[in-house]
Amino acid sequence: MNSRIIKTSCTAIALLVGVGILWLAYTTFQSRYLRPFDNQATLFDGSQLRLPAELAGPGPIRVVHFWDPACPCNVGNQQHLADLVSHFAGDGVSFHVLQKPGSRGQLPANLSALKPLASLPGSEHLPASPAVAIWDRQGHLAYFGPYSEGAVCNASNSFIEPILKALIDNRQVTASNTLAVGCYCPWAG
């Protein structure tokens, strides 16, 4: 009789400990990775962005990824960015990255092809990240804004593929001011 009570008690305690561990894991995940979707519109104004002197002027199509390592919104666009690099790097497109000043972090290995920039004139006025700026072959800003609109970023809802395809086909694109709703983190401060 005593051993039966001990077995039942041990099973109940193990079950409670297991439920407690699952609850702790769930709440930790939720507080760290899940957050309410902020449907506030963000205006991306590229009027003050300039390429650094060493990249300015005629050359390849240049894509600059604005990256804040602490922003949880990066998770959604990093695989998409890696796909862009693998698809368009051979088509005369160079990929660069500007890390948020004062932040610390390292890009994932699949984004090691992005060339780091120390600074980019006008980037101190960025409203949010992740964001992207694309300059055409003549060195004119063709696009500035988010990768996509909405809570998730992927090729099916991306603004970037059509713009890069148009620029590769030598069609003019002018979209340096964009209003979008999505997962973004403040860049300034």
Language model region names:
Residues M1-S47:
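N-terminal targeting signals for export/organelle localization
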Residues L107-P146:
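Short, internal strand/loop/helix patches
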Residues Q99-G105:
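Short, polar loop motifs at secondary-structure junctions
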Residues E54-V75, L81, L164:
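Short active-site neighborhood of thiol/selenol oxidoreductases, capturing the structured segment around
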Residues S86-G90, H140, K165-Q172:
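Sec-exported extracytoplasmic/periplasmic mature domains
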